[in-house]
Each structure stands twice: as C-alpha cells, then as structure tokens.
C-alpha cells in the first residue's frame, strides 16, 4: 500500500529502552474567538514503549485505511463518525499511552502567547513534554511537520534547552500523509479536542473509546 510506511525506525536503533512519541494538536493558536478561532487548543502525545507494538499499530492503521475506504489519510476533523469508530477499534488492541494538555484560551492573558502563534505552540509543547510523568526517557520524538525550516530548528533548540538532557534522544518533523502513527496522534488529539465541545453531538464518544490508553489529560487554565 502506498502512502504510509510500516518501518518505524531502523532496526539498529532499537534497544531495551525504546520510547517512541508521536505528537500532534487539535485546534489552532489564534485568539479571534468570536470569528473563527477554536476556543480550545489540545496537544497530545502518543507513547509507545515497545517497538513491536508500534509496528503492529502502524500496520493496523494501514489495513483500516483500506477497510474503511479512506483514500488519503486519517484526520479526525475530516472523518465521518463511522470512520472514527473504525479507526479507534482498529488501534484498541495495541499497547500505547496517551498524555495531553487542553488549553482553554479564554484563560490566557499573556500578550506574547495571544499574539505570537509560534511562541504559543512552542510553549505548550514544552509544557506537555515537561509534565510527562516520567514517560520521556531518551525518547524518539516525531511531530507533524508543519512550520517552516527556521521555526523547526528554533523549536528543536528551544526544547533541548528547556527540557534538559535525558528526555529527548532526537526529534523529527514528519509528513503525516506518510506516517500512520502521526495520523494516530492526530486522531487522539482530535478525540480529546472534540470532548471539550460539549454542545456537539457525541462530543465525548471517541475520548471514551480512548479511555484505557489515557495516562493523563491536563486542563490548563
């Protein structure tokens, strides 16, 4: 199948301390809350502590893509309810953890965070990774590859500086279209984000499906 690769990391990089983390967000960093910006911003990380589980989950997502007739990639906000149900059912057997931060933008008063989207993104990514419950130990981090090249360099330097040694082995920005596990992070962030919108039908449905995987969701206020 084209579009998603199964190989997660070169075999030579795999050891007993394997930690793979996939990060994506739901919502936007904008503050035009009365004219289109989302009221909540959610950032989630999916944590695999076993290489084989990561490979099997990736394969299952690819197979679900065929079974559910998804022609491009899994994106929570572009999927119908049937596809969302099928996706979360497909990944349920595999061992991974979920940690997330939910930002209620109405509680953010910092001028810098409200007016500089890249600073907003970097700040909450750092908070998510810093409050990791001990999950990040020499972790291989993959982030959905949005942003320009300079921002990616600056973000990588910022995280290494702020987090200190030991948490992050390497950080890569990847194309979600080519990485099934980044699509998993998108679907997870989307499910948690949807649960915040209590006026929406089935707002908590997919977060409930994820409940056995969730290690922590931090409501930042």
Stretches found by the model and what they are:
Residues 1-221:
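Phosphate-ester processing/binding pockets and catalytic centers
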